[in-house]
Design a protein with these regions (language model features):
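Structural motif
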Residues: 4-5, 130
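Hydrophobic faces of well-ordered beta-strands that scaffold small-molecule active sites
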Residues: 7-11, 40-47, 135-138
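Glycine-rich, proline-tolerant flexible connector loops at the mouths of alpha/beta enzymes
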Residues: 13-18, 134-150
Length: 176
């Protein structure tokens, strides 16, 4: 349906490689439906843990997981995996999600926006390079962490050269 009628396609958190696969699949389906595949924009869920050192960020991640409400996460896992049985492939989008992935309910940890400002900016640029237009970020301490993200990460992202392939007249990305 997204390929036929949607302006935006939002993905759960995932690796750069899997995001690229989803984007390519949706664009191919859009073209098969007679749409310009570049009319569809792509959003990605991500959970940000920005710290001065990688180990500090990963310690925060371990703390979040250790303090998770296990009953709630297991209940969510059971429900979404059961719901996945109703999909065409009989799995659903959370089939490969671990307990740790589901602590941040839309697989936000899978984006790996966890580390130093430089690491996070580089990850965001990698997602942009495969066609992600927007990263929907979650934060542990929303006000403080969002402010920190805006001050320390966004300027780095803006300073990085865009890696997004330019569309051609036919709407296809230029290949190297």
């Amino acid at each position: 349906m997204a390929a036929r009628v949607s302006d935006w396609y939002f993905m759960n958190g995932t690796s750069v490689e899997k995001a690229a696969e989803q984007i390519q699949e949706i664009r191919a389906l859009a073209a098969a439906h007679g749409r310009d595949p570049h009319e569809i924009r792509f959003g990605l869920n991500g959970f940000v843990i920005c710290r001065d050192a990688e180990e500090e960020a990963h310690a925060t991640l371990r703390e979040i997981i250790a303090n998770a409400d296990h009953e709630a996460v297991e209940g969510f896992a059971s429900q979404v995996k059961h719901a996945g049985q109703a999909t065409a492939e009989k799995q659903g989008m959370w089939a490969e999600s671990t307990f740790e992935d589901l602590v941040q309910y839309n697989d936000g940890f899978k984006t790996r926006l966890i580390g130093t400002p430089e690491h996070i900016a580089t990850r965001i640029a990698a997602y942009e390079a495969v066609g992600v237009d927007l990263v929907l970020c979650g934060f542990l301490h929303y006000t403080d962490d969002l402010t920190d993200f805006g001050r320390r990460v966004i300027p780095l992202v803006r300073d990085l050269p865009s890696q997004r392939p330019a569309p051609t007249e036919a709407g296809e990305a230029l290949s190297a």
